[in-house]
Amino acid sequence: MSELSYRRILLKLSGEALMGDGDYGIDPKVINRLAHEVIEAQQAGAQVALVIGGGNIFRGAGLAASGMDRVTGDHMGMLATVINALAMQDALEKLGAKVRVMSAIKINDVCEDFIRRRAIRHLEKGRIAIFAAGTGNPFFTTDSGAALRAIEIGADLLLKATKVDGVYDKDPKKHTDAVRYDSLTYDRVILQGLEVMDTAAFALARDSDLPLRIFGMSEPGVLLRILHGEQIGTLVQGRS
């Protein structure tokens, strides 16, 4: 195959991606399949970092709407991302990978604190880095956390795996005539309100000239194909 188009990537997975067909928690078969995909990408020569959401366990914003204090709910959501990060670490290590979980909040008995230089060093040494607890601040989603960490580690590409195979002009599950975009600018995504990531994450990536590819990860080998330059999903970059 061709040479890699990207040498350092950050892959954002939703917590829901770990559920499989279930309504809650982690499906071992699903997390093992995702772990295989990540290791395949690393073995091809890429430095790989991960951010995983926590929606399969807890959503702070949802309970805040029901009356829970938003800050408390967001802190609980951060802990959910740590649970998912540890689960992914276990799955990757069982396949022989060297992995470090780094948290934005202090939880030193189970993972490291996020320190930028240390995170980059882990990647340079061939370890997979999993960044947990978002930005460490309430009111910010794990999408924003993923964009921030990707910028901090100098990633060549931010990847967001979704349930659909890119960005559409309308919901493809509800509209059979929905059209998928091959590429978009950040300004157009924000202006049109295309809700595939939150606006803060889009703006952060735009202002740092970080390209973003949104794609579906249901097909085996898709991550490796993207690393080799295949135009899969929707590429978001630049300004209008």
From Swiss-Prot:
Pathway: Pyrimidine metabolism; CTP biosynthesis via de novo pathway; UDP from UMP (UMPK route): step 1/1
CDD domains linked to this entry: AAK_UMPK-PyrH-Ec
Subcellular localization(s) per the UniProt record: Cytoplasm
The keyword Transmembrane helix is assigned to this record: no
Signal peptide interval: none
Residues the entry annotates as binding ATP: K12, L13, S14, G15, G55, R59, T162, Y168, D171
Reactions catalysed according to its record: UMP + ATP = UDP + ADP
Keywords: ATP-binding, Cytoplasm, Kinase, Nucleotide-binding, Pyrimidine biosynthesis, Transferase
Molecular-function annotations in GO: ATP binding; UMP kinase activity
InterPro entries linked to this entry: AceGlu_kinase-like_sf (IPR036393), Asp/Glu/Uridylate_kinase (IPR001048), Uridylate_kinase (IPR011817), Uridylate_kinase_bac (IPR015963)
Regulation acting on activity, per entry: Inhibited by UTP.
EC number: 2.7.4.22
Main location: cytoplasm
Sequence positions that bind UMP: G54, D74, T135, G136, N137, P138, F139, F140, T141, T142
GO CC terms in record: cytosol
A GO biological-process term: UDP biosynthetic process
Disulphide bonds in the chain: none
Subunit structure and binding partners: Homohexamer.
The protein's role, per its UniProt record: Catalyzes the reversible phosphorylation of UMP to UDP.
Entries under PANTHER family matching the protein: URIDYLATE KINASE, URIDYLATE KINASE PUMPKIN, CHLOROPLASTIC
Family as reported in the entry's similarity comment: Belongs to the UMP kinase family.
Record's protein name: Uridylate kinase
Organism of this sequence: Xanthomonas axonopodis pv. citri (strain 306)
Origin organism lineage: Bacteria, Pseudomonadati, Pseudomonadota, Gammaproteobacteria, Lysobacterales
